[in-house]
Amino acid sequence: MIKIDFKWDYKAEKKLFNFFRRTAFLIFSGKKIDTDYSSLAKIFINYSVSCEKKFKKLKNIDVKKHTEIAAKQIKETKNWQNNLNNYIEENKEKDNLKDKLRNNAKFRARNMLGNYYKDFLKEIVANESEYFEWNTMGDERVRPTHEARDGVVYNWDNAEIVPGEEAGCRCWATVYFPETKEEIEDINQNF
């Protein structure tokens, strides 16, 4: 049986943080911004294609599917940017606005990567595999409901949620690719 860990990608999160922070501070500075969403799409697509290459040859990867998932996040980013414009306009006199913008960019990066990760798992990985094991970061910031899931194997069709689905979630999946009927039966017995 093949088991692949799709661990949380801190490098992708950092790239997203830099994108959101830069966007927020450009809005804050009052400069007219022309956001390059292609760089955002590239971050998302490179992330998920590199994950999919763990179990599939590059020539068999449907990049269009990755692009569709990235487009959802870009739409969400545009909504965030519009809301941010309004928020900054209403709060530009506050002393702690820069700190709030930085914190928002950090949360936004983690949340957007989690949303993208969730969509990648549900729309691409679940089509190739039946099962995944829930993993947490194992630190004090893991919420109790996710800690209770740590190490539990789920069937994609029966899982209430998947890693990354809830706001700020940093959990990740170990995906099972059983190769024989016996391996599937073994998972089902422990499921």
Predicted regions and their residues:
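Generic structural motif
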Residues: 137-139, 176-179
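Betabetaalpha-Me/HNH-type nuclease active-site subdomain
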Residues: 153, 158-159
